[in-house]
């Protein structure tokens, strides 16, 4: 998106604040419906960040896949759960909660140690549409596929494992 510098920076900071507040709302709101709608807000803001950085294909994929399909599915599943039956068997602390907190704490610690060591000056940000090298959608899609299978193989596999665990959890909740 071709925006002047101060407007671009203001929109970037505003979207960042909405992302942080929306993420906190997803985790902290007691009503699962409100959390699901907050997740939709976060996913839309991520799509707007993609538009701001001239990644229109990723923005469209984000809106169609995550907001249009996954978030609607989450809201649909939450609306069919009976809250009184779900919360009466809930233990305050389980072994899975301990394992999850250890994994999340270790991921947080690794991010905190990795982010300051990253050379952010080597990253080239495209803020103008005339700086995009490839205009052909097929070439851009092929480049995304090549990067997913080479440079971003480990994060791609981690996301697939997270989606598999979420699917198993959804099946376990549906069986109860």
Swiss-Prot record:
- The answer, when asked if Plastid is one of the entry's keywords, is yes
Q: What is this protein called?
A: NAD(P)H-quinone oxidoreductase subunit 6, chloroplastic
The record's section on Pfam families has: Oxidored_q3
Output the Gene Ontology cellular-component terms: chloroplast thylakoid membrane
UniProt function note: NDH shuttles electrons from NAD(P)H:plastoquinone, via FMN and iron-sulfur (Fe-S) centers, to quinones in the photosynthetic chain and possibly in a chloroplast respiratory chain. The immediate electron acceptor for the enzyme in this species is believed to be plastoquinone. Couples the redox reaction to proton translocation, and thus conserves the redox energy in a proton gradient.
Q: Which organism is it from?
A: Trachelium caeruleum (Blue throatwort)
Q: Where is the protein found, in the record's own terms?
A: Plastid, Chloroplast thylakoid membrane
Q: Which family does the record assign?
A: Belongs to the complex I subunit 6 family.
Query: Which EC numbers characterise this protein's activity in its record?
Result: 7.1.1.-
**What interactions and quaternary structure are annotated?**
NDH is composed of at least 16 different subunits, 5 of which are encoded in the nucleus.
What is the membrane topology noted in the UniProt record heading this document? Answer: Multi-pass membrane protein
